[in-house]
């Protein structure tokens, strides 16, 4: 069974968010998602300064098995991207909730967080797959 940290929020499309001290949110894909995709070979990230809409495809995770769109769990401006993934996409596999993060976003509507799932709700989504 996949690790699902309780302190994070999740989208049913397998992205997670973690609130940072400055009010921004770090975004990545869940351990379950990286397990389904397999070994990462390339990650395409949004650009710093991009404005995202919740649910918009904004990144791509490409593995030996497939390429998968990554969706913005929140609307807002991209503040940072994980440049380490450019040379080391396998960080998504080895540390999905840590060094394998994708980007940070400053939300334009924090109420959107209420649309995301807690760990228990996300586990239910996985169980239904």
From Swiss-Prot:
Binds 1 lipoyl cofactor covalently. Residues 24-106 form the Lipoyl-binding domain. It comes from the Bacteria. It holds the Pfam family GCV_H. InterPro entries: 2-oxoA_DH_lipoyl-BS, Biotin_lipoyl, GCV_H, GCV_H/Fam206, GCV_H_sub, Single_hybrid_motif. One of its GO terms (biological process) is glycine decarboxylation via glycine cleavage system. The modification N6-lipoyllysine is found at residue 65. Its cofactor is (R)-lipoate. PROSITE patterns: BIOTINYL_LIPOYL, LIPOYL. One of its GO terms (cellular component) is glycine cleavage complex. Keywords: Lipoyl. Disulfide bonds: none annotated. Belongs to the GcvH family. NCBIfam families: gcvH, PRK01202.1. The glycine cleavage system is composed of four proteins: P, T, L and H. HAMAP family: GcvH. The glycine cleavage system catalyzes the degradation of glycine. The H protein shuttles the methylamine group of glycine from the P protein to the T protein. This is Glycine cleavage system H protein. It comes from Shewanella woodyi (strain ATCC 51908 / MS32).
